Amino acid sequence: MVAQTLDNLKQMKPLKTELMRFMMSYKFALDEMNTKINILKQEFKYIHDYNPIEHVTHRVKSPESILKKIQRKGYDLSLASIKEGITDIAGIRIICSFTSDIYEISNMLQRQKDIKVIKCKDYIKNPKPNGYQSLHMILQIPIFMSDREDHVYVEIQIRTIAMDFWASLEHKIYYKYNKEIPQKIKDELKEAAISATQLDKKMEKIHKEVNEIKELDNDEENLQELLINNERFHVPDDFLIPIKRAYYDS
C-alpha cells in the first residue's frame, strides 16, 4: 500500500511541475509586458515631458476561473487546449488620460518586434450595445525559461479614466442584479456612456488648447535666448517686441 502511494506521488510530480510552469509562464508574460509599459512611461516622462499612462493593473486568472471558462466554452481539459483556447489568462489594463493616448500606446506596443498581434477589437469606434468602450488586444510574446522558449498570450485593455469608471460601475451593477439588469438601469447606463464619451472629447480639446498655448509661451522664451557659437545671448524686450511686430506685419 505504501509502495503504491509512493508510485502515485512520483507519477504526479511531473504533472505538478508542468502545471506550475504553465501558470508561471503567464506571470512571466505579465512581467515582460509590464517592463515594456514601464519603459514607455519613463521615456514619456523624461523625454517628452508628458506621461499618457495614468495607471496600470494586471492579473492572472485563477485555476477556478480558468476551469469555469473551459466548461462554458466546451474545451478539452488539457493544458494544450487551455493555452490555445483561452487567450485572456494573463491580462493587463492600461488607463490613459485621453482617447488619442489609447491609440498611441497601442501603436507603440504593436511596433515592438517581439510582440505578435493576434487580435484587436476596437470598442471605442464601435461601442458594445450597452455603451461599453475600450480597446482590446490579444498579444503573443516570447518567454524564455531555463529549458524552453514559450509563446504566451496576453490580453491588453486600454481605456480612458472615464471609460474605466463607467465599466467598473456597470460591472458592479451587472452582478448586483445577478446579470439581469432592469431596462431602466440599462438605458441610464447607456446615457452615462454617451456622457463619458462627450467628457473625454471635451477634456482632450482643452488639453490640446493648453498645449498650444504652452508651445507659444515656449517659443516666446526661446526667442529671448539666442545661442551663437556656444555663447548665450539674452535679447531684451525693447529690442524683441518691434522686431516681432515688423516680422508678423510683413
Name each model feature, range by range.
Residues 2-30, 34-43, 155-250:
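An acidic, glycine-/histidine-flanked metal-binding catalytic module
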Residues 60-70, 96-101, 135-142, 203-204, ...:
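Short, charged low-complexity intrinsically disordered segments located at boundaries
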Residues 83, 96-205:
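Long beta-strand-rich cores associated with HINT superfamily self-processing modules
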Residues 89-96:
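Terminal, regulation- and interaction-focused segments at domain boundaries
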Residues 24, 28, 61, 65, ...:
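Charged, alpha-helix-enriched surfaces in structured cytosolic catalytic cores
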Residues 20-81, 88:
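Active-site acidic/histidine clusters and adjacent loop/turn architecture
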